[in-house]
Amino acid sequence: METINTTERLAALRDLMKKNKVDIYIVPSEDSHSSEYIAACDARREFISGFSGSAGCAVVTLDKAALATDDNWLLLKQGLQDVPTWQEWAAEQSESGKVVGVDSTIISAPDARKLLEKVKKRGGSDLVAVEENLVDLVWGDNRPSRPKEPVKVLARGFSGKDVKTKLEDLRKELQKKKSSGFIVSMLDEIAWLFNLRGSDIPYNPVFFSYASVTPSSATLYVDSSKLSEECITHLNDNGVSIREYSKIFSDVEVLSQSLDSEDAKLKKFLVSSRASWALKRALGGDAKVDEVRSPIGDAKSIKNETELEGMRACHIRDGAALIEYFAWLEHQLVVEKVEMDEVIAADKLEQLRSKQKHFVGLSFDTISSTGANAAVIHYKPEPGNCSIIDPKAVYLCDSGAQYFDGTTDTTRTLHFGEPTEMEKKAYTLVLKGNIALDVAVFPKGTSGFALDALARQFLWEEGLDYRHGTGHGVGSYLNVHEGPIGIGTRIQYSEVPLAPGNVISNEPGYYEDGSFGIRIENIIMVKEVETKHQFGDKPYLGFEHVTMVPYCRKLIDETLLTRREKHWLNEYHADIYSKTKDFFKGDELTMSWLEREIEPL
């Protein structure tokens, strides 16, 4: 791994801070669209800090610099007891009237508001929007260019719903909220709304854009050079105007002026609660804007039947690729005695996936991790800086792919030698939690917050736990992490009940630092189920699993499983066999591995 000396960069940034009369400068991880994954041109926090982790925020003063990140990284444990958040640390530094600055296009309006409150409380002077991004100025000509990848139309056979219908549904929501319009800033929401896909951000089939939808108009803001004639015709046919990406802020200022009349004052514009501070300011601030949970995000999270069928189909193909990979990997390590590192193994898995129908690319960096590396939740092996896979240790593989008909995310933990009793016990407790969530039946209106304990209960009985959520929403040929639903202890997961059509992960785990890690992840879909009674006349819901990859037989301690759990496991494995066996005709190695792993308990 390349070592980055950030001393000169920080010195240059501090010079610019002085010129702009800023004492403290905030460098978030996000781009202008609050994206989880970002393009290289937006990796400002990594550039200034040298830290390439998946989440965090850099705070730079004239004589100090701090980096806060989530507790999936052990080097800095924001979110743990007695460790301040970046907002708290920045506010502490702002005492005695100091000024805090930030690029207002890359911080959300709620985050900016919370930061200002903390700064004022600690005696700071103000939070100011610095017009030019100071890190970009330090980066200069070496900053990567903004991607200009082509945008493509997603066929109706994959989307399941046309753009006109989606716009009609959105306008009904605007009418309910008595709103003048919705300014859309989340890239996956724009891609979904207009049935378009791109590749501007690694692993996410999205493209840089904004959108504006009013009762009488719809406008897509995008670099028009990225649009083919097919895209232009597609948008025009659906009543969507095209404007250049750079015009969004000037255009929303004009839209804001339309609210100056007495008749319009009660009809605010809506923005997502993750929209940037800059966007909200351009629209006129609180007087003219309401921050809401995005109605597009809500609609997108409930898949239509075409999308659900696509998820079923792509998970069968993806499962076949994973089964072939695990059989191949075991043979290479155990029989051929090949020394293989984590990256080479991950590359082989990508190669096998790429042969599957409708394959587009990966949905995130493959976590191919052996031994102690498996205990690092967001571990990312790098060429030249990864481990040789140890056949005598636990191997955890968390991976996924993008297909035209869906998005996959599967984790399996395997052992190619003789696991310890603790490894088997931990694996089986995690498996029991995975099964408990899969078979859960619950009344309509139940949130993922309420279900989280089902997956943890068997670990809790032993005084064990894991420091991550149990489930995240999954897009349909879109982002692998999709809101607003989730299963976990975060209070936000109590705000949105699960609904039929939701697609979500089921991924309990257990990790022993420096030793091993266990995680089992299936993708499950919410559906209505029949129950003998319906208390309160409420429908009851359950799950349908679509992941088709067997569990590791060697790691299962059968004595810890109930008869019901064994029956469920045998039925699941039989289902996998029936749906994937035709992929392995003539492939004795893979078929032999599969038959061994699914042998009934």
Swiss-Prot record:
GO terms for cellular component: cytoplasm. Keywords: Aminopeptidase, Hydrolase, Manganese, Metal-binding, Metalloprotease, Protease. This is Probable Xaa-Pro aminopeptidase P. Its cofactor is Mn(2+). Its EC number is 3.4.11.9. Catalyzes the removal of a penultimate prolyl residue from the N-termini of peptides. It catalyses: Release of any N-terminal amino acid, including proline, that is linked to proline, even from a dipeptide or tripeptide. Binds 2 manganese ions per subunit. It is an enzyme of class 3 (hydrolase). The keyword Oxidoreductase does not apply. It holds the Pfam family Creatinase_N.
